[in-house]
């Protein structure tokens, strides 16, 4: 008896546990959760008058940053923001300079001879070691800038007259042609244009300027940008604890140069180094206290001579000049002090494992055999490509004895340029006529750190893309995923719709991210306001993008921004519709907290509502999302079936429905069906009974009787009874009187 009682009690307890302790999936909309993303960004700028920024969104500096109490991983090299910057700047650069005509006709044999009175690049050591604004060299050609060795070539091609060959004269730098050593005739060598058979070469159609463009990147609606705000961030940080969120990056300027970065926006009153997480690539931000700058100048005049190769094809050449090396660059500022601080900062870097003696840390040039863009400092000055030999400058910075030291570098302008982002070569027009000058602020150094046992070399690099690792490497693009799952004991939820107060304070799109560092319980209490903030921000960003698209309908093909802006808007709409469609498929449309009937899949996995953030919880349940989503969809399908059946029953609950005309027509229809059914049933029953009687030998009642003779019974006379009075009474009823 006692055992049965215990069993009953245990059963009751188990039932109560299943009823009250079972947890169900609850859908939350508006939670501060995100994932890494790689969608196209769009641009914003203040100056929309230039061709490169006319399609950008107007910049109003209204980009507040919100501090997040979270920890995130940042990597300047594995970063979609920096990759997009490199691709976009390259597209703008290529569109601006416009190389377009293939020069395969120049891959012909040429008869060349060297010009006279040529000197080597750095053979002259005369002149002042340092110059400034008041020096004569600043306004004229600097003494000591050697002449570039050039060659004068002749070749024959079919010109406008197809049946005749015409002789052409062309001047090349000696490094732009390759000559056969054992093939000389009359003191002339047989030469070809260098690299003509190894790359696709194009020539510029017209002369264009490459002006720097200032812009910032902005995330589409539904996305955001996180930034590591840690001063010790060095380009790779798996756990950055000082994170801020924004919709746009800082303002940046397009840069295209090797060795140095010009006019960057990351310069501070300190020197810091971004170091690649897996190799020796670095980008060094220079201290702006030292006022480092570069001033480049091309004195004198130049003339351009067009050469008609054939109908519709013109190659632009320049005549032999007594001073082919046309440019030089002067470095201003406290360069020696700045370079010394770079060495000291390198020693303190956590990844540095070399010598601690700054005397054994040297700035060096790349090795021989490198491309010209690597061996020389390459930059663009007013549309002209300068190649500067930095030997004198490095000797001056390092104060190397017995070496030629100058704070300026000799430069020359080239026509054949190696593309800095893709493999290939472009041929541009010779320099435009007149004097050219350009001034820039030096803000960074691109270098590789080569560490030996007792010596460290800081070798200058030609990785132009590294400039954008420094500019945008502390950002990362995220996709806001405001839909979250968590287990609760509530099986279903129903309440009257709550009316929103008019005075709700909206922080903007990033307002709900401010609760990312809060506990899950605290963040869940404000989901209504957060979801309204999220939707309001998305609508606001979409409206801004729509304004841009309306103004750029006729200029979508000019720059890369037109396509990216349209793609950003489409991405935003797709994301919003995807979230709403997903909520609707679960039966949770327009609800901030949606309780379901789906049991929680893992009872051992439960959130800590008081101490765990939504981002931390999301990382734990991410592998369950597919199963949860499928279960929610199946439950919603079953719920819709149940609702359909219930709606069919609900039509009989309302008393007024009984008096509906359409209902009465149905009732009459049903009555006719019933009467006809009863008649048919009676006929069927009668036929069955008739058949059963026939089988037993009975005739139907309604059948005609066969002919027969009626028998009349004749009774014999009996004597008259004595008592006649009683005879009448006693006679047989069956008798007949005759």
Curated annotation (Swiss-Prot):
GO CC terms in record:
host cell endosome membrane; host cell plasma membrane; membrane; viral envelope; virion membrane
Entry's Gene Ontology molecular function annotations? structural molecule activity
User: Site annotated as Cleavage: where?
Assistant: 502-503
In this chain, the stretch annotated as V2 covers 153-196
Q: Where is the stretch described as MPER?
A: 648-669
Signal peptide (UniProt feature, chain positions): 1-21
Enumerate the CDD domains for this protein: HIV-1-like_HR1-HR2
Protein name listed in UniProt: Envelope glycoprotein gp160
